[in-house]
């Protein structure tokens, strides 16, 4: 018996089972009740004809051949196994593909990481070279500056040694000027310390703080006014000194032309 005939027989068998399941159950037998029926002249009712029921027939089995249901069941199982095996194979193929993609992704990440590390190494090496170059240039400039300072000091020492005795007087005058400047600076600090009084306002109330602030403001305003007046006075004095010096210079020029030099302070000395 061929596979097609077996499948045909199997389909007919399945159709027969489905028809039996869908067929309604046979009506229950109603006992006959003998009652007297009175004849009534009524219109005749049309009796509904019962629908013909499908006749169930057993599947035709070809004569001379036997159906092997075990063989059919075995083929079904083999078919299911083949489908299951196909699903398993497709699952493993997809899994293998995902693993390959994951491996490729890891390789790309490692490659990118190595490239980034190489770039950082090159950048660090260039930065180190730049720092070394800057350090060398700085050391060279410092060496040149030290050499130039040494040469300048040597020239100064030679010039001062050539001055001879005037060097000691020069140092004495320089020390004297420094002493005067130091003394004036110390006097200024002393005067400022005397004038500057400590500001104790922790115990003052709000009104007294306002009064104190107004007092300080008035003092500051007065100081600024005095400063401005002193500045204007100093400007006038400088202007007067400049005019006097110009007059003295003109008088000296006229006296030189006349041949006689008047007595006056010239070059810091009286003549």
Curated annotation (Swiss-Prot):
Compositional bias annotation for Acidic residues? 1-21
GO BP: regulation of muscle contraction; skeletal muscle contraction
Provide the positions where the record notes the PTM Phosphoserine: 2, 90, 161, 168-169, 205
Which residue stretches belong to region Disordered? 1-74, 113-194, 248-271
Its keywords, alphabetically, are: Acetylation, Muscle protein, Phosphoprotein
Q: Mark the residues carrying the PTM Phosphotyrosine.
A: 221
Composition bias of kind Basic and acidic residues appears in 31-53, 62-74, 113-155, 183-194
Q: Name one Pfam family in it.
A: Troponin
Q: Show the InterPro entries listed in the entry.
A: TNNT (IPR027707), Troponin (IPR001978), Troponin_sf (IPR038077)
What SUPFAM superfamilies is this protein classified in? Troponin coil-coiled subunits
GO molecular function annotation: tropomyosin binding; troponin C binding; troponin I binding
Q: Which GO terms describe its cellular component?
A: troponin complex
Q: Which family does it belong to?
A: Belongs to the troponin T family.
Explain the purpose of this protein: Troponin T is the tropomyosin-binding subunit of troponin, the thin filament regulatory complex which confers calcium-sensitivity to striated muscle actomyosin ATPase activity.
PANTHER family, alphabetically?
A: TROPONIN T, TROPONIN T, FAST SKELETAL MUSCLE
Protein name (database record):
Troponin T, fast skeletal muscle
Annotated organism of origin: Bos taurus (Bovine)
Q: By which gene is this protein encoded?
A: Tnnt3
């Amino acid at each position: 018996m061929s596979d097609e005939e077996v499948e045909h027989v199997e389909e007919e068998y399945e159709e027969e089972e489905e028809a039996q399941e869908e067929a309604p159950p046979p009506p229950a037998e109603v006992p006959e009740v003998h009652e007297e029926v009175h004849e009534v002249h009524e219109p005749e009712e049309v009796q509904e004809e019962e629908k013909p029921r499908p006749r169930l027939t057993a599947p035709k089995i070809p004569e001379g051949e036997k159906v092997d249901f075990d063989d059919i069941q075995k083929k079904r199982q083999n078919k299911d196994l083949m489908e299951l095996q196909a699903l398993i194979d497709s699952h493993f193929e997809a899994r293998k593909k995902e693993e390959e993609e994951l491996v490729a992704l890891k390789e790309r990440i490692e490659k990118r990481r190595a490239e980034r590390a190489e770039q950082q190494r090159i950048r660090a090496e260039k930065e180190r070279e730049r720092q070394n170059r800057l350090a060398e240039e700085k050391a060279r400039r410092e060496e040149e500056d030290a050499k130039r300072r040494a040469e300048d000091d040597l020239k100064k020492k030679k010039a001062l040694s050539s001055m001879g005795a005037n060097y000691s007087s020069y140092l004495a005058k320089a020390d004297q000027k420094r002493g005067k400047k130091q003394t004036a600076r110390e006097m200024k600090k002393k005067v400022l310390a005397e004038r500057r009084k400590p500001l104790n306002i922790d115990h003052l109330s709000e009104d007294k703080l306002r009064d104190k602030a107004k007092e300080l403001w008035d003092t500051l305003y007065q100081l600024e006014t005095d400063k401005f007046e002193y500045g204007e006075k100093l400007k006038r004095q400088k202007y007067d000194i400049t005019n006097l010096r110009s007059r003295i210079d003109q008088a000296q020029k006229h006296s030189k032309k006349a041949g006689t030099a008047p007595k006056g302070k010239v070059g810091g000395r009286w003549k």
